[in-house]
């Protein structure tokens, strides 16, 4: 399961810093969030899929590390990203 190319392009366009930017932490976090949300839906139906659950936990960990990096380097961008993605309540 992956994020469709069109959806991925929309996410990149929404969160990129400049034209052609696909590697900034904001874009990476947004793409990981989309994949995590898709997998979360998968687990509602396939509760015993432990191999995919390991991949999900790995993605969550990678997103956490990117968010920590962004929080240390650019707190304003971090807060805006959290708000936009709706990650904190």
Swiss-Prot record:
Q: Which Gene3D superfamilies match?
A: 6.10.250.3130, S15/NS1, RNA-binding
Q: What is this protein called?
A: Small ribosomal subunit protein uS15
Q: Where are the transmembrane segments?
A: none
Query: What's in the GO CC field?
Result: cytosolic small ribosomal subunit
Name the gene that codes for it: rpsO
- Tell me which UniProt keywords the record has, alphabetically: Ribonucleoprotein, Ribosomal protein, RNA-binding, rRNA-binding
GO BP field: translation
User: What biological function has been recorded for the protein in this entry?
Assistant: One of the primary rRNA binding proteins, it binds directly to 16S rRNA where it helps nucleate assembly of the platform of the 30S subunit by binding and bridging several RNA helices of the 16S rRNA.
Family matches, as Pfam families: Ribosomal_S15
MF-aspect GO terms: rRNA binding; structural constituent of ribosome
| Binding partners and assembly | Part of the 30S ribosomal subunit. Forms a bridge to the 50S subunit in the 70S ribosome, contacting the 23S rRNA.
**Family assignment from sequence similarity:** Belongs to the universal ribosomal protein uS15 family.
